[in-house]
Amino acid sequence: MQSWGSRMKRSFFVFILVILIACPLLAPSEDPKTQTSKSKKTVYDYSLVDLDGKEMPLSSFKGKLLLIVNLASQSIYRDQIDALNELQKTYADQGLVVIGIPSADFGGEELKDPAALRKYYRETAHANFQVFACASLRGVNEIPLYRFLTDAKQSLPGGDIHWNFTKFLVDRQGLPLARYEVDEDPADVGFHVTVENALAGKLKKKVQSAKGDEAGGDDDSDDDE
């Protein structure tokens, strides 16, 4: 016959066992939306290499509205660089940061030599916005930032970029907000209004459809080369 002490000890162990089994069942499950928001990537998860070869995390621009553009100094659309300068000058105080990423992927219309690239954007184009090193923006060598920006599941519809001067607006939380193709001129009043609305948090997430597989591509003439 078990003693009173033995029965108490056995009852105590049974009680502990019940608690251990019941606690996970009673604990509130995490909201799936919360789980999604925690795992959702932003541009702040990526970094770029600047014209001097130094890596810069995009988290440096937290809280800013970003306009990310792939540049091409030899393109017939290179006058858009002046328009980007104007946007940076006009809206910097309100929180706009223009980010330019040169690339020779589209028609080979960018300088590949780092010294020539630095000289062009600093001395010829007088870029007043952040210009990074020449990068691959499609194919097997596509940089991680552009894999993210062109992934419809994580970012915006539209797929791989089609030509130079494709523009991505990224909100102050680091989430892609809108995409515009080369034929959307940043010098236009309408584009300035778009930026103003985005700065004010009034622009809804959207995408401008590309007009063909090589939307807005430079013509084949050599007039501007």
Segments predicted by a language model, with ranges:
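Bacterial N-terminal signal peptides that target proteins for export
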Residues: 4-15
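Bacterial N-terminal signal peptides
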Residues: 15-24
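N-proximal helix/coil linker or "cap" segments that precede and/or mark the start of modular domains
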Residues: 23-45, 204-214
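N-terminal "domain-start" segment that seeds a small globular fold
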Residues: 30-59, 77-79, 143-144
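Short active-site neighborhood of thiol/selenol oxidoreductases, capturing the structured segment around
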Residues: 60-76, 98-102
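Structural microenvironment flanking redox-active thiols in thiol-disulfide oxidoreductases
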Residues: 77-142
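Thiol-/selenol-based redox modules, centered on thioredoxin-like
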Residues: 147, 151-225
